[in-house]
Amino acid sequence: KGVVFTVLALLVHAALADAPSFDDVKSRWVSTEGILLDRHGAPIHELRVIEQGRRLEWTQLSDISPAALATIVRAEDKRFYRHDGVDWLAMSDAALDTLLFSHPRGASTISMQVASHLNAALRPTRQKRTASQKWDQISAARELEKSWSKKQILETYLNLSTFRGELQGLGAASRALFGKDPSGLDQPESLLLAVLLRGPNAKSAGVARRACQLAADMKAEVACVQLQRLALSALPAAPNIAPRVALAPHVARALLSPNRPRVKTTLDAELQAYATQLLQQQLAALGGSHVADAAALVLDNRSGEVLAYVGNAGSSTSAIYVDGVRAPRQAGSTLKPFLYELAIERRLITAASLIDDSPVNLITPSGLYVPQNYDRDFKGLVSARTALSSSLNVPAVRTLMLVGAEAFVERLQVLGFDEVIHDGDFYGFSLA
């Protein structure tokens, strides 16, 4: 018999020898959320990049409210700080309940549950563990307590446990269900989270009922009706984590991925927010004209760095999928600066040169072309500087006639406008 027990002990020890350290577990933790940073390192957009599960950054015990810690420990393992991994008294009570009253209930400690999280072989199949699994779980929990501190065990438990649906970890559950970080959890919220650990997908009425019982056991001054209301409002069918910052959805979708969950950009968060606000205000002013989309790209002229990238400031549900910065469309006034630059470079005009902004009729192969300004008004003689800053169309057409369409096309191609593939005659006055 002694030989048999020795062999069993050696087998158990060999199985547990590969148990990871706390630092290993923490280092392997991967959030499902990507984060886009601006040029100063400030978060500018959060985006889910992994579809399996829902996890946030690892939550430390110091970042969890005292109410949440005390409530969860009381609900899950009230003698957690006094046992060596196994609560033999709780196991005896559970065995008696099963034997005498046929009311099976669990007696797994937090340490035992962490051991199961770390070793798939210890997890139950079809809601039940075999006797050998239970024994291995007990042995694993006791071994875990020899190398891990209580704080490390509790911290790991609160990060690896599933609370609701796909929400793994207290950080994800707190944000999704209550819209706050774990440091701000109050007593009623902590009661709901504590009972969710044993029934993550229970209906709100059942969760509220068990939370009410837990409050009574703890002598917590929380009314049952308050817990019922909180459960109804906080436990939707499909809980979701709202991003804390969402200023650059199009850039985030282009740059963030499971392999690149954290990317620093040249964007400036303040300028990005300001550009978005300006576009939204302009869209609101143009609401009567049925204008629903607007985009903006702001570059640093000296370095070429992108400082703001608003792909679409529209409010429609499809706006985040339509990137107006990249979408092919008419050039509008975006080519005018290059046109005037070429004219000045060739000494055809200066910034102070006067250009006639008056009606003009131009003959083209497709018929008569009569350029108009945006406001349908003409300003008369204006400087090239004013014509460009006011985005006047007629002076731009007159400048194009000075430069020549073919020369301007060649300049655009040199500058990297790869979409300009035809000769000057093909584009004609539309280049201005």
Region roles according to the model:
Residues 78-82, 101, 200-202, 285:
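Short beta-strands and strand-coil junctions in structured, solvent-facing domains, enriched
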Residues 64-67, 83-101, 135, 225-242, ...:
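Acidic helix-start/capping segments at beta-turn-to-alpha-helix junctions
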Residues 97-124, 239-241, 246, 349-408, ...:
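Conserved catalytic neighborhood of penicillin-recognizing serine enzymes
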Residues 42-57, 168, 172, 253-259, ...:
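Short pre-catalytic segments that frame enzyme active sites
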Residues 1-39, 79, 235:
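N-terminal type II signal-anchor transmembrane helix
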Residues 67-76, 213-221:
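A short alpha-helix/helix-coil micro-patch that ends at or immediately precedes a cysteine
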Residues 29-34, 39-44, 54-56, 64-70, ...:
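Extracytoplasmic
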Residues 14, 103, 107-273, 410-413, ...:
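Non-catalytic, structured segments within soluble enzyme domains
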